Amino acid sequence: MPRPDKAAVVAELKEEFQTSSGAVLTEYRGLTVAQLTELRRSLGQNARFRVAKNTLTKIAAKEAGVTDSEVLDLLKGPSAIAFVKGDVVEAAKGLRDFAKENAALVIKGGLIDGKPMTPEEITKLADLESREVLLSKLAGAFKAKQSQAAAVFQALPSKAVRLVQALADKRGESQ
């Protein structure tokens, strides 16, 4: 590639590193173009799967502030990166599921919210439910606790009223 083209690729990759919430590094040796297209579709709207030269990717990562040698050392062999803009769990699930079906895709590791991740950690992340599901479960738990508290607070005055009524009825009977 001529020098201006390489600079443009480095600039694009640098922007991807800076604007992404996560980057998952994979090895794609043996995948066909059709399989790569299928993988890109399976990742959805919030992730972008890029194939770039390792040297250019390392330069872009360093320019973007990625200094962790664990991540940079993963850039060996035919590497591709899934840059995640939204829900990292959804993208991790897409990569894990595709890797199960296609043994040629190997998850090498990644960088999520600036922290290096091993392939095992990315697989564990894929086992989690999505952010929206977890938030809805949390909201449901809060609502249930509030309903229980409201029932307790409502029960106390009603018990007191019934007690006073029972005492009044008893006094009325005794007179």
Curated annotation (Swiss-Prot):
InterPro entries for the chain: Ribosomal_uL10, Ribosomal_uL10-like_sf, Ribosomal_uL10_bac, Ribosomal_uL10_bac_type, Ribosomal_uL10_CS_bac
Assembly behavior: Part of the ribosomal stalk of the 50S ribosomal subunit. The N-terminus interacts with L11 and the large rRNA to form the base of the stalk. The C-terminus forms an elongated spine to which L12 dimers bind in a sequential fashion forming a multimeric L10(L12)X complex.
Protein name, entry field: Large ribosomal subunit protein uL10
Function description: Forms part of the ribosomal stalk, playing a central role in the interaction of the ribosome with GTP-bound translation factors.
Keyword RNA-binding appears in the UniProt entry: yes
GO annotation, cellular component aspect: large ribosomal subunit
Keywords associated with the record: Ribonucleoprotein, Ribosomal protein, RNA-binding, rRNA-binding
GO terms of molecular function: large ribosomal subunit rRNA binding; structural constituent of ribosome
Family to which this protein belongs: Belongs to the universal ribosomal protein uL10 family.
CDD domains assigned to the protein according to its UniProt record, in alphabetical order: Ribosomal_L10 (cd05797)
Gene3D superfamilies named among the record's database cross-references: 3.30.70.1730, 6.10.250.290
One GO biological process term: translation
